[in-house]
Curated annotation (Swiss-Prot):
Its main location: nucleus. Pfam families: Ribosomal_L10, RL10P_insert. The keyword Cell membrane does not apply. It is found in: Nucleus, Nucleolus; Cytoplasm. The keyword Nucleus applies. One of its GO terms (biological process) is ribosomal large subunit assembly. Associates with the pre-60S ribosomal particle. This is Ribosome assembly factor mrt4. It comes from the Eukaryota. Component of the ribosome assembly machinery. Nuclear paralog of the ribosomal protein P0, it binds pre-60S subunits at an early stage of assembly in the nucleolus, and is replaced by P0 in cytoplasmic pre-60S subunits and mature 80S ribosomes. Belongs to the universal ribosomal protein uL10 family. Transmembrane segments: none annotated. InterPro entries: Mrt4 (IPR033867), Ribosomal_uL10 (IPR001790), Ribosomal_uL10-like_insert (IPR040637), Ribosomal_uL10-like_insert_sf (IPR043164), Ribosomal_uL10-like_sf (IPR043141), Ribosome_Assembly_uL10 (IPR051742).
Length: 223
């Protein structure tokens, strides 16, 4: 006897993201807030962490951070004297390179420079991070780690054995090497052994204020 089958309706439509709308929103945001702030800072950053950036945003709740593609940020501020939102903003956009962002604020310049120059937050390195130091783990027992972790550690490349319920490192092992990018496996090992060698920090490239753009001394020397 043939069993009847229910017709199944398959929706073949696919929801596509509209990157154009996101760009328009960012450009619109820049145009909306540029009159609200006296200073616009251009900064670069290293080893960005969203959770730590969230804390920074909270500390500067009356100011505004903006991130996006440099080309879009340039469009928002203006690429030339003809289309810039404020006099000399095009000079700021000329330096939008690499990983950077914009910081809009009315806070005093000295306060901003003091904060961002001294800001530094340690974290565990991600894959691709280039270490400034070589870290090794010595041969012998691992203290404070349960025996059930041995297989996992070995899978990450650490030469280990289990002896009487204790994990032993069979020989000295390099967790990371100075000047060499960290692998995904090394990233996990460094975290397991509590090595926070990555540092999230900012570098101010320049700032716009009162219709003038000032390039920071360090940046001008590099150029």
């Amino acid at each position: 006897m043939v069993k009847s089958k229910r017709n199944v309706v398959v929706n073949m439509t696919k929801v596509t993201k509209n990157p154009g709308e996101k760009k328009k929103k960012l450009v619109s945001t820049i145009k909306d807030i540029v009159d609200q702030y006296k200073f616009i800072y251009l900064f670069t950053f290293e080893n960005m962490r969203n959770n730590k950036l969230k804390s920074v945003r909270t500390e500067w709740s009356t100011s505004k951070f903006l991130f996006g593609k440099n080309k879009v940020l340039s469009v928002g501020l203006g690429k030339s004297e003809e289309d810039e939102l404020k006099p000399n903003l095009h000079k700021l956009t000329e330096h939008l390179e690499g990983e950077c962002g914009l910081f809009f604020t009315n806070e005093p310049k000295d306060k901003v420079f003091e904060y961002f120059t001294n800001y530094s937050e340690k974290d565990f390195p991600r894959s691709g991070f280039v270490s400034e130091e070589t870290i090794t783990i010595k041969e012998g027992p691992i203290v404070g780690m349960t025996h059930s972790m041995e297989t996992y550690l070995r899978g990450l490349g650490l030469p280990t054995t289990l002896k009487n319920g204790v994990i032993f490192v069979d020989r000295e092992y390099t967790l990371c090497e100075a000047g060499v990018a960290v692998t995904p496996e090394q990233s996990q090992l460094l975290k397991l052994f509590n090595h926070e060698i990555s540092e999230f920090k900012f570098h101010i490239k320049g700032f716009w204020n009162e219709d003038e753009f000032t390039l920071c001394e360090e940046e001008s020397q590099e150029e």
